[in-house]
From Swiss-Prot:
One GO cellular component, as annotated: nucleus
GO molecular function: deoxyribodipyrimidine photo-lyase activity; DNA binding; DNA photolyase activity; FAD binding
SUPFAM superfamilies: Cryptochrome/photolyase FAD-binding domain (SSF48173), Cryptochrome/photolyase, N-terminal domain (SSF52425)
PROSITE patterns cross-referenced by the UniProt entry: DNA_PHOTOLYASES_2_1 (PS01083), DNA_PHOTOLYASES_2_2 (PS01084), PHR_CRY_ALPHA_BETA (PS51645)
Main location (coarse class): nucleus
Keywords: DNA damage, DNA repair, DNA-binding, FAD, Flavoprotein, Lyase, Nucleotide-binding, Nucleus
Organism (species): Arabidopsis thaliana
Binding site for FAD: 256, 269-273, 307-315, 415-417
GO terms (BP aspect): photoreactive repair; UV protection
Tissue specificity annotation: Highly expressed in flowers. Expressed in roots and stems.
Known role: Involved in repair of UV radiation-induced DNA damage. Catalyzes the light-dependent monomerization (300-600 nm) of cyclobutylpyrimidine dimers (CPDs), which are formed between adjacent bases on the same DNA strand upon exposure to ultraviolet radiation. Required for plant survival in the presence of UV-B light. Not involved in the repair of (6-4) photoproducts.
Induction statement: By high-fluence white light, UV-A and UV-B.
List of residues binding DNA: 307
Name under which the protein is recorded: Deoxyribodipyrimidine photo-lyase
Length: 496
């Protein structure tokens, strides 16, 4: 039986009403423009698109637009994303829903596709980031008034606009609002069945040469190579969450609340951030499964849900309601004034972007954190705070510090260009979602962190050794791969 399950109205925003059509009248297809939530299962936007199609007896398709160098993403991020999409393409085919990959400026490709297929409805993902919102606004303007456009927040457990209608000051101010709505939104997903009506047109555009596309993207973005520690795709994400071998909830959960802030115990972390960032796993699925095992480790589950739901959704809130989410202008007034009062304070060291990027500072702990990010694609969460605060201490002023931290985060982190990444930099450097602390040079009233504090918290030498070993192994692997590539391009010919 085809899916007829409706999504809660509070999860949907109507961006354009479109023309009313009688139920017995043939209408155009429903198109789901996927971008932030790249999965088949547990996807409210796809569920809504199929439901719309079934209620209007129309076919449904999924389109994904590949932006040209979106926010300077490199092989590391694009390779991971495209390999996940390749898997998704095959999975969606099993439901007899066509998947179309478009390339270019979405402001042009999406309206053109909608016109060509005669769509009646467009369903889109939600993102708080300005580039996506501007693009979506243009798509709304450039499409026919007869087309209905619905935006679905399938990324957050509680939809961003339902959780709060304003910029929240801290986790404390949004936590109660989210928890109050969890009974309404933290519910099990319905099973997604094939749509009633099959898609028949434009099948020539459905073919995607994934191997060639991935090879091209990886080659062009080789400055930041792919990583091996996390396998892309929806299946891999679920395995990391709850696999029998090394799943977070099944094997590693009990140490989360006690060890998650210890950089020499990276296995205590969930390892889910790449999958959550690309939408290959639903945060709601993670929360549902975590609740099932709460009796075994209540403190660990509660801590995990705080990070997974409250902190992540606070980041979306900030990026949506604060247009200057990546600028000193976005800091609270007390923090901005304090930082500017101390902007001209003498710094012990001033490092260039190149020195910072290569980890060439006088602080071996900071260098290790930077190299962990460069070579592993994931800096430990505790070290991210120390890392960003030291950039504030070692650059000419807070604006430069924020700019450099965001640039490096977006370039090297597998989950870069995420609201949580922007907010992490803003918290560390600009005191966003934090309070004022004892005033001191350079930092003003921004929370201070130093080497001695880290040394009291964990074994600094062990962390530095761990990163050195990681870098050495990674370099050897890359050198061997590069030699293999050279040999395949220019093989040595033996004359007998």
């Amino acid at each position: 039986m085809a899916s007829t399950v409706s999504v809660q109205p509070g999860r949907i925003r109507i961006l354009k009403k479109g023309s009313w059509q009688p139920l017995d009248q043939t209408v155009g297809p429903v198109v789901y423009w996927m971008f932030r939530d790249q999965r088949l299962k547990d996807n409210w936007a796809l569920i809504h698109a199929v439901d719309l199609a079934n209620r209007t007896n129309a076919p449904v398709a999924v389109v994904f637009n590949l932006f040209d160098q979106f926010l300077d993403a490199k092989a590391r991020q694009l390779g991971f994303m495209l390999k996940g999409l390749r898997q998704l393409h095959h999975q969606i085919d099993s439901l007899q829903i066509p998947f179309f990959l478009l390339q270019g400026d979405a402001k042009e490709t999406i309206p053109n596709f909608l016109t060509e297929c005669g769509a009646s409805h467009l369903v889109t993902d939600f993102s708080p980031l300005r580039e996506i919102r501007r693009c979506k606004d243009e798509v709304v303007k450039r499409t026919s008034d007869s087309l209905a456009i619905h935006e679905v927040d399938a990324h957050n457990v509680v939809p961003m606009w339902a959780a709060s209608s304003k910029l929240e000051y801290s986790a404390r101010t949004i936590r109660g609002k989210i928890n109050k709505l969890l009974p309404d939104y933290l519910i099990e997903f319905p099973k997604l069945e094939p749509p009633k009506k099959k898609w028949t047109g434009m099948m020539d555009k459905k073919l995607v040469d994934w191997d060639s596309l991935i090879d091209k993207v990886v080659r062009e973005g080789a400055e930041v190579p792919e990583i091996e520690w996390c396998v892309p795709g929806e299946d891999a994400g679920i395995e990391v969450l709850m696999g029998n071998k090394d799943g977070f909830l099944t094997k590693r959960l009990k140490n989360y609340s006690t060890d998650r802030n210890n950089p020499i115990k990276p296995k205590a972390l969930s390892g889910l951030s790449p999958y959550l960032h690309f939408g290959q796993v639903s945060a709601q699925r993670c929360a549902l499964e975590a609740r099932k095992v709460r009796s075994t480790s209540p403190q660990a589950v509660d801590t995990f849900l705080e990070e997974l739901i409250v902190r992540r959704e606070l980041s979306d809130n900030f990026c949506y309601y604060q247009p200057h989410y990546d600028s000193l202008k976005g800091a609270w007034e007390w923090a901005r004034k304090s930082l500017m009062d101390h902007a001209s304070d003498k710094r012990e060291h001033i490092y260039s972007l190149e020195q910072l990027e290569k980890g060439l500072t006088a602080d071996p702990l900071w260098n290790a954190s930077q190299l962990e990010m460069v070579y592993q694609g994931k800096m430990h969460g505790f070290m991210r705070m120390y890392w960003a605060k030291k950039i504030l201490e070692w650059t000419k002023g807070p604006e430069e510090a924020l700019s450099i931290s965001i640039y490096l985060n977006n370039k090297y982190e597998i989950d870069g260009r995420d609201p949580s990444g922007y907010v992490g930099c803003m918290w560390s450097i600009c005191g966003v979602h934090d309070q004022g602390w004892k005033e001191r040079p350079v930092f003003g009233k921004i929370r201070y962190m130093n080497y001695a504090g880290c040394k009291r918290k964990f074994n600094v030498d062990s962390y530095i050794s761990y990163v050195k070993s990681l870098v050495s192994v990674t370099k050897k692997k890359r050198k061997a791969e590069e030699q293999l590539t050279r040999d395949s391009v220019d093989p040595k010919i033996t004359i007998v």
